[in-house]
Amino acid sequence: FTKEKPWGLVKLSIASLRTGGKHAAEMATQAIMGTPVKILEFAGDWARVQTPDQYIAYIPKNSMYQITQAQLDAWRQSTRYIVNVYQTQLADTPKNGMTVSDLVMGNILEYKGKSGKYIKLATPDGREGYVHQSEVKELSEWANQTFDAELIKKVAFRMMGSGYLWGGTSTKLTDCSGLVKVSY
């Protein structure tokens, strides 16, 4: 932990947070790309962090991008987009590009521009690529949308048949509370 960089932004589509600083420890929860975590301490290759929903758990240090308070404030003030499809890829070119990162519903990336029907975005650690405009939505617009019970049900029902993972909170694998989190 450093006082200069007390925050981290999850830089992977999904990061598993564990009850202890080792891969064999029980999974506590998951955090997805763009989630800010407060760094409490470092333990070897792990960081003990607190998530916005108050979980305290360990994340591999290489799963997050460590930042200052000013960088976190700038991230929060930037134009950001949220992934609104179950899974997609951030590609290095608008059409048929190489994968820069996989993405899942709820991932948050910073807006960098537009090329035709593709939005140029950057991951928290600065990797840039393109996503079709139909697969993302401006975060401020998404956050202010009207509650839609039918859409929530549609998302939940679409998850039927997906794999189960204790502590899972993404469209790849969920547990019961993760299903609720993904659906809303």
Language model feature labels by segment:
Residues 149-184:
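Catalytic cores of peptidoglycan-degrading enzymes
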Residues 1-13, 32-35, 41-42:
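Charged, low-complexity interaction regions that mediate assembly/partner binding
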Residues 22, 41-45, 114-117:
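Short, conserved beta-turn/loop elements at beta-strand boundaries and strand-helix junctions
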Residues 10-33, 83-111:
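Beta-loop motif signature
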Residues 16, 48, 89, 120-122:
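Residue-level detector of beta-strand face positions
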Residues 1-6, 51-85, 94-99, 105, ...:
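Boundary regions of SH3-family modules and the immediately adjacent low-complexity/disordered segments
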Residues 38-47, 53:
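Short, solvent-exposed loop/edge-beta patches enriched in aromatic
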Residues 24, 30, 102, 145, ...:
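Solvent-exposed, acidic/flexible segments
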